[in-house]
Curated annotation (Swiss-Prot):
Belongs to the RNase PH family. InterPro entries: ExoRNase_PH_dom1, ExoRNase_PH_dom2, ExoRNase_PH_dom2_sf, PNPase/RNase_PH_dom_sf, Ribosomal_Su5_D2-typ_SF, RNase_PH, RNase_PH_bac-type, RNase_PH_CS. This is Ribonuclease PH. It comes from Mycobacterium avium (strain 104). NCBIfam families: RNasePH (TIGR01966). The keyword Nucleotidyltransferase applies. GO terms for molecular function: 3'-5'-RNA exonuclease activity; tRNA binding; tRNA nucleotidyltransferase activity. Homohexameric ring arranged as a trimer of dimers. GO terms for biological process: rRNA catabolic process; rRNA processing; tRNA processing. Phosphorolytic 3'-5' exoribonuclease that plays an important role in tRNA 3'-end maturation. Removes nucleotide residues following the 3'-CCA terminus of tRNAs; can also add nucleotides to the ends of RNA molecules by using nucleoside diphosphates as substrates, but this may not be physiologically important. Probably plays a role in initiation of 16S rRNA degradation (leading to ribosome degradation) during starvation. It comes from the Bacteria. PANTHER family: EXOSOME COMPLEX COMPONENT, EXOSOME COMPLEX COMPONENT RRP41.
Length: 259
């Protein structure tokens, strides 16, 4: 089989590195690297929930996505300087939030909020899928932090793992984890978010200048789910290590009558 320009097989992921505890202050902080794409994902815990959720007893999870000005070959102005977020930034932020909310029992958080921030340090395609995959690991660490602080009503609020990958048709062949060079000329481009229980959270697919048959869609999904299985294995391996920071001390146990 002819290999891709970067030497990979069609079903092969780029070299993947997940570094926990990348920064000190958030409850969860991860640097995830898919080849040359590098995204910092943090999960911060704050007391309280949005106004529309107050009094419900439920927690909330929100997400923001951004790219550093020099994340690509050509520097771009910060969106904060422009005074408004682009449609792309808003779309990806919402995608990350939806994806992570699919795996967590918000009732277990009480009225606390987990804010997930995904900042692209270097972009070479697949930034949104890398952000989701890394953000799940940061979220898992934030849950560990909340559990240690005694703030969870359920000690295991995560029902599954979440990962995402890009797939596409390039040069007539189905390929996974597209770098920018392949993404820019793909005949079909798709992002797939999945759970480690085999279900789908979201599928975003587009024919770039051409249509594609149902059979191609099925093959793309098969390739994406197989790639996600590898991502789940990498997440599990990363999370085997102890929590990378200092955990808070939970509230003291209630006194027993007569003690």
């Amino acid at each position: 089989m002819t290999r891709r320009e970067d030497g990979r097989l069609d079903d092969e992921l780029r070299p993947l590195v997940i570094t926990r505890g990348f920064t000190e202050h958030p409850a969860g902080s991860v640097l995830i690297e898919f080849g040359h794409t590098k995204v910092m994902c943090t999960a911060s815990v704050t007391e309280g929930v949005p106004r529309w959720r107050k009094g419900s007893g439920l927690g909330w999870l929100t997400a923001e996505y951004a790219m550093l000005p020099s994340a690509t070959h050509t520097r771009s102005d910060r969106e904060s300087v422009k005074g408004r977020l682009s449609g792309r930034t808003q779309e990806i932020s919402r995608l990350i939030g939806r994806s992570l909310r699919a795996c967590i029992d918000l009732a277990a958080l009480g009225e606390n909020t987990i804010a997930v921030d995904c900042d692209v340090l270097q972009a070479d395609g697949g930034t949104r899928t890398a952000a989701i995959t890394g953000a799940f690991v940061a979220l898992a660490d934030a849950v560990t932090y909340l559990s240690a602080a005694g703030k969870l009503s359920d000690p295991r609020p995560l029902s599954c793992a979440i990962a995402a990958v890009s797939v596409g048709v390039v040069d007539g062949r189905i390929r996974v984890d597209l770098p920018y060079e392949e993404d820019a000329r793909a005949e079909v481009d798709m992002n797939v978010v999945a759970t480690d229980t085999g279900t789908l959270v979201e599928v975003q697919g587009t024919g770039e200048g051409a249509t594609f048959p149902r059979s191609t869609l099925d093959k793309l999904l098969d390739a994406a789910l197989a790639a996600c299985d590898k991502l789940f294995a990498a997440q599990r391996e990363a999370l085997k290590l102890p929590y990378p920071g200092v955990l808070p001390e939970g509230p003291p146990p209630p006194k027993v009558f007569g003690s």
